[in-house]
């Protein structure tokens, strides 16, 4: 896509200028294909890759759990708030309407989990080559 974008022309122009260009982007996403059942109350957030709330019910072997949000510098709307994160290609699905939502969200790109693709932020510094004789 770079060749056909405005960025390509911008990089070409900047390659003739004595400058440094720093390129970065937001975190990425991951293609999900493995549902994990989770139960929460009606105040539980709707994100498919992480949940926060009170009284979350899940299989602890399938998720990464933070029971004390302050220790991870995360906000806690209530004293009993905990966070549950999906890893790898997993996504959360509620047992009610499970058979409807699993095919709907399977093979979609999601973010908010703890995979490398979602946690790492790409960063590159571009410097023009020095030209001989000028």
Label for each model-derived stretch:
Residues 1-134:
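Feature captures the catalytic ectodomains and active-site-proximal regions of enzymes
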């Amino acid at each position: 896509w770079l060749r056909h974008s405005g960025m390509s022309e911008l990089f070409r122009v900047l390659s003739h200028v004595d400058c440094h260009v720093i390129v970065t982007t937001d975190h990425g996403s991951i293609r999900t294909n493995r549902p994990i059942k989770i139960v929460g109350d009606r105040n539980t957030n709707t994100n498919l890759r992480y949940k926060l709330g009170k009284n979350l019910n899940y299989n602890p072997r399938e998720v990464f759990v933070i029971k004390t949000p302050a220790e991870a510098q995360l906000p806690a709307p209530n004293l009993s708030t905990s966070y549950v994160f999906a890893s790898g290609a997993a996504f959360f699905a509620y047992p009610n309407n499970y058979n409807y939502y699993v095919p709907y969200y399977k093979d979609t790109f999601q973010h908010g989990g703890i995979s490398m693709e979602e946690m790492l932020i790409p960063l590159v510094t571009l410097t023009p080559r020095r030209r001989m004789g000028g």
